[in-house]
């Protein structure tokens, strides 16, 4: 009917700390995007068509029509059909975040290597503000054998001329 979207998570999904990533993580994360305290800038763009969005934005997060009938199934109910919803669901704003880490660290959860728990092919191993971020291969990534790089280093530069000179 174009109103119910069901996503099936693959087996063996893990956070970079080795704990299981489940459909409940998506439920928490998507509701968090609607939280007026978080004030996510793209909330309406990516979730405005989800049933209960307005109520969730007003503070009733449980009104957002997202659910996890089991650990590997994430269900989203829309107010009306949205043919490009699959593309919106891939938007970075809707990436899952680990509830325990966010709740334990508040707004600082994403500002240090120790508290930035992720689920991608790399995880942050070093973060020196104003200098660099080093990411290492995540051994808990579902397809870790396909990742050939051992690490990536992002050099942080505010001066665009210095960045261009370093690039050359």
Residue ranges and their predicted role:
Residues 3-39, 121-168:
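Extracytoplasmic/periplasmic ligand-capture domains
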Residues 8, 21-27, 34, 38-100:
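Surface-exposed binding/hinge segments that line
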Residues 61-63, 71-72, 78-151, 159-161:
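Gly/Pro-rich hinge or "lid" segments in bacterial periplasmic/extracellular proteins
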């Amino acid at each position: 009917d174009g109103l119910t979207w069901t996503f099936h998570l693959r087996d063996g999904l893990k956070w970079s700390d080795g704990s299981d990533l489940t459909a409940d993580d998506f439920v928490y994360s998507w509701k968090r995007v609607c939280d007026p305290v978080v004030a996510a800038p793209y909330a309406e763009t990516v979730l405005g068509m989800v049933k209960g969005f307005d109520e969730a934005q007003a503070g009733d997060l449980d009104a957002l029509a997202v659910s996890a009938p089991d650990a590997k199934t994430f269900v989203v109910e829309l107010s009306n059909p949205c043919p490009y919803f699959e593309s919106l669901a891939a938007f970075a704003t809707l990436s899952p975040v680990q509830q325990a880490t966010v709740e334990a660290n508040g707004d600082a959860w994403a500002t240090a290597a120790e508290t930035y728990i992720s689920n991608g092919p790399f995880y942050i191993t070093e973060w020196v503000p104003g200098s660099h971020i080093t990411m290492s291969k995540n051994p808990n990534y579902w397809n870790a054998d396909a990742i050939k790089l051992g690490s990536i280093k992002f050099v942080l530069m505010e001066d665009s001329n210095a960045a261009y000179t370093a690039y050359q």
